[in-house]
């Protein structure tokens, strides 16, 4: 999502079907963020959404990184890509994983900001290197 709005608008219940609509709403309730726009956007193509859901489930929550580190990586990617929606969504999710407001401010500064552990600095540096 950019300042101008989404390039592809999230689908309505009619666009995405009852199951995807329910998944997006339940996900939003569980995370405290409201209906998940990403789910409703990808859900416009049901096969894409199902494949993405399997993929994303292997990364989060089924990934090998601890949840806090996963959230730091997602926040850094969202910041570098200028994706305000994803950034704000994961600020909320990150709080549950132990990401503080100070961490969020440092994510914006990047891996050279003070206060990161050596491991966190490596993860954020990897994000920056993959981005550039």
Could you describe each region identified by the protein language model?
Residues 117-132:
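Acidic/histidine-rich alpha-helical segments that form the ligand environment
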Residues 1-65, 95, 112:
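Acidic, glycine/proline-rich low-complexity segments that act as flexible tails and inter-domain linkers
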Residues 42, 59, 77-81, 130-131:
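Generic structural signal for hydrophobic core residues of well-folded globular domains
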